[in-house]
Amino acid sequence: PMEIEGNYVDCVVVVDKLGIPEKIVSGTTQITRSPDRLLIAELTAMFLEKSGLLYDGATMQAGAGGTSLAIAVFVHEMLKKKGWKLSFGFGGSTKYMVKMLEEGQMGYILDAQAFDLDAVRSVEENPNHIPYSVFNAYNYHSKGNLTTMMDIMILGATEIDTEFNGNVVTHSDGLLLHGIGGWQNCLHARNVI
């Protein structure tokens, strides 16, 4: 599918250079160093395995926050140990998802956003790393919608209450955070972690 649909284009402008690749890296795309969050990540990956949500051929979306990235690393190690392969990953992609693809633990990456330079390189070089429009991926009226095909969706939140309502808009002090990422499509999915 096209990355930008024609009905969203007013004009096309030719430029000498498109963007500054070295500024693509986001501050959120670093694995957490917090021992507590690393433990949460490890326990989450173990839960995915023990519950049967993680299996050979499963599909996964992993967020770009520090704990989400750590979960993806633990999942990658499990996949290698078991000889399993994810059917596809949906991104925002990072170097951790690219590593799964390049090492054979993921068949494809369907990518709506590249979060770091490894992901940018992979989209350019790897035929199994496929740009995928958010107009299709997140639109539950679209035949290209991915949310109902996802087995595992891992995203960060600042707060979760006892009824599993997630806050991704503010810190607990009420100050606005940043973009909400993939939450809007994940809420339509079968499994959200």
Mark where each language-model region is.
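Beta-strand-loop-alpha "switch" segments that mediate conformational coupling across diverse proteins
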Residues: 65
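Conserved phosphate- and dinucleotide-binding cores of soluble alpha/beta proteins
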Residues: 1-59, 70-79, 84-87, 96-193
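Active-site histidine-anchored catalytic micro-motif
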Residues: 91
